UniProtKB/Swiss-Prot annotation:
Compositionally biased spans, kind Acidic residues: 84-93
GO process terms (BP): regulation of DNA endoreduplication
Listed InterPro entries: SMR (IPR040389)
Disulfide bond positions: none
Entry function: Probable cyclin-dependent protein kinase (CDK) inhibitor that functions as a repressor of mitosis in the endoreduplication cell cycle.
Top-level taxon in the UniProt lineage: Eukaryota
PANTHER family according to UniProt: CYCLIN-DEPENDENT PROTEIN KINASE INHIBITOR SMR12, CYCLIN-DEPENDENT PROTEIN KINASE INHIBITOR SMR13
Protein's name according to its UniProt entry: Cyclin-dependent protein kinase inhibitor SMR12
Phosphoprotein keyword on record: no
Region Disordered: start-end pairs: 84-106
MF GO annotations: protein kinase inhibitor activity
């Protein structure tokens, strides 16, 4: 295999991918035509219409191909889809509406609000307050008994080795 122009090779690959995509659309279109012909439509049929012009009746014959019929069917399907969407919109209209009076509108902000600030100092103060709690209910007798009890325990303890 020879190494050729890379740009041309890339374009060739892209063109092949594009052709594959179009082939899929073409296959889908052919499937639709086959489905319509399965329903009894021929590839080319004659259409007869009676036209009355001032009391003289004429019969016109026109050729209709499946392409026209397919386009008509697609347009009818599209119209039906649009009608279904309109019905859905009507179902959503349940009598409640967003108020539109000026007093119910959100005011226009002329200036941006200031940027949010860190609140670490408040959190730090809160922590220190919990750590430095003062005991205001201790009378001197309770404090003295507590201290003497601690002194007695420390003097009577023996260190084991």
């Amino acid at each position: 295999m020879e190494i050729g122009n890379v740009k041309a090779d890339v374009n060739l690959v892209l063109n092949l991918r594009e052709a594959e995509r179009h082939r899929r659309y073409f296959d889908y279109f052919i499937d639709e035509i086959l489905w319509l012909s399965f329903l009894g439509m021929s590839e080319t049929s004659l259409k007869e219409e009676e036209v009355t012009l001032g009391g003289v009746k004429e019969t016109r014959e026109e050729e209709c191909s499946d392409d026209k019929l397919v386009l008509d069917i697609c347009l009818k399907r599209k119209r039906l889809d649009e009608e279904e969407e309109e019905e859905v919109v009507e179902e959503e209209n349940d009598g409640f509406k967003t108020p539109t009076r000026p007093e119910n509108r959100i005011p226009i902000v002329r200036e941006c609000p200031p940027a949010p600030m860190k609140r670490s100092s408040e959190m730090f103060r809160g922590r220190t307050m919990y750590c430095r709690r003062r005991l205001s209910f201790l009378p001197e007798d309770d404090v003295n008994s507590f201290i003497t009890d601690l002194q007695w325990r420390t003097t009577t303890m023996t260190i084991k080795k």
